[in-house]
Amino acid sequence: MLFIGLKKRVKIGKFPIEIEQEQAISPAYSQGIEQLIKRDLHPQAWKEKPFNPIQDFLGQSLPVKTQFYAKIGWTFNNRNDAAIIVSPDNKAHYILVVFGDEKKFYQDKEFFPILSRQVYNQMLKK
């Protein structure tokens, strides 16, 4: 069962690509959005906040010096995360978009961080 429509999924998936390619309206606008969604992965920057885009999402399991830009979505019946991820050594630079519409995925707080770390490790092997 799809809780997020296909058009919305495509828009969420295109969002980080348009930012990376500076095509989100204009280069200046894209750079502005990138700064708005830039996330500090050091735990002291997010750990004590009641709502943050790191804990239980794609950034939680990544090294703290990773460049991380993310836009999350979370409702009562789904979670999604769209992120631009750059390793500290710049060997890995990729976009990861994950939708968790099934109950077992959107209720599992470990799924997104585990998946993210596995993708990160694989990207570093290239």
Task: Enumerate the predicted regions with their spans.
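Penicillin-recognizing serine hydrolase domain
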Residues: 1-126
